């Protein structure tokens, strides 16, 4: 029988908290995601998000989502003792926006501690809480009842169109403009 003094010291675990929103979320898009509870993964595992339940740990019940939409991979920065994450867009048809950085197919970047992730009408607010362990990490999902862009005072942006590309017409305008119907 082990004693208190002989017990292993328990390390804290890095947690990636994801608050998510979609205007059609009441239709069951997120029904396969367990909200509020934390889920633990080994740090060697790549976490996949998409609509294919055979390949992805987190699935969306939405035909507009790619089989694998994006992946999160933990890693350790050089000279760092904590886990970081990189995100890679796996969709050929839809760009992924991380804050104001657009990621095309197979583009990847390091995730900041707090960022807004968007594709289509999906909005994710990702926040990382550092832990001591480099052997594992946790994810936690929270569903927002309101759009995250307005709730967190992020700059309003247009949804990413289905073809995955932003039109310069939409990205260069800073405010709505009126147009006479004869100008169309």
Swiss-Prot record:
It is found in: Cytoplasm. Keywords: Cytoplasm, Immunity, Innate immunity, Phosphoprotein. It comes from the Eukaryota. Its main location: cytoplasm. Highly expressed in the spleen and at lower levels in heart, brain, lung, liver, kidney and testes. It holds the Pfam family FHA. Adapter molecule that plays a key role in the activation of pro-inflammatory NF-kappa-B signaling following detection of bacterial pathogen-associated molecular pattern metabolites (PAMPs). Promotes activation of an innate immune response by inducing the oligomerization and polyubiquitination of TRAF6, which leads to the activation of TAK1 and IKK through a proteasome-independent mechanism. PANTHER family: TRAF-INTERACTING PROTEIN WITH FHA DOMAIN-CONTAINING PROTEIN A, TRAF-INTERACTING PROTEIN WITH FHA DOMAIN-CONTAINING PROTEIN A FAMILY MEMBER. The modification Phosphothreonine is found at residue 9. Phosphorylated at Thr-9 following detection of ADP-D-glycero-beta-D-manno-heptose (ADP-Heptose) by ALPK1. Phosphorylation at Thr-9 by ALPK1 leads to the formation of an intermolecular binding between the FHA domain and phosphorylated Thr-9, promoting TIFA oligomerization and TIFA-mediated NF-kappa-B activation. This is TRAF-interacting protein with FHA domain-containing protein A. InterPro entries: FHA_dom (IPR000253), SMAD_FHA_dom_sf (IPR008984), TIFA (IPR033621). Residues 168-177 have a biased composition (Polar residues). Disulfide bonds: none annotated. One of its GO terms (biological process) is tumor necrosis factor-mediated signaling pathway. It comes from Mus musculus (Mouse). Residues 47-103 form the FHA domain. One of its GO terms (cellular component) is cytoplasm. Belongs to the TIFA family. The gene is Tifa. Coiled coil: none annotated. The FHA domain recognizes and binds phosphorylated Thr-9, promoting homooligomerization and subsequent activation of NF-kappa-B.
């Amino acid at each position: 029988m082990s004693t208190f003094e002989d017990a292993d010291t328990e390390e804290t675990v890095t947690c990636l908290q994801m608050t998510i929103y979609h205007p059609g979320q009441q239709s069951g898009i997120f029904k396969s995601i367990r909200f509020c509870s934390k889920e633990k993964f080994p740090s060697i595992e790549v976490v996949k998000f998409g609509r294919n339940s055979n390949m992805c740990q987190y699935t969306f019940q939405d035909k507009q989502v790619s089989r694998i939409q994006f992946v999160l991979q933990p890693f350790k920065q050089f000279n760092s003792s904590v886990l970081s994450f990189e995100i890679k867009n796996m969709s050929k048809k839809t760009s992924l926006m991380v804050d104001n950085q657009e990621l095309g197919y197979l583009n990847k970047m390091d995730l900041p501690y707090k960022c807004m992730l968007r594709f289509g009408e999906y909005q994710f607010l990702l926040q990382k809480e550092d832990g001591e362990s480099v052997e594992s990490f946790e994810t936690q999902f929270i569903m927002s009842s309101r759009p995250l862009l307005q709730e967190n005072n992020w700059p309003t942006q247009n949804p990413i169109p289905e073809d995955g590309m932003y039109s310069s017409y939409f990205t260069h305008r800073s405010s709505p403009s009126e147009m006479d119907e004869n100008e169309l």
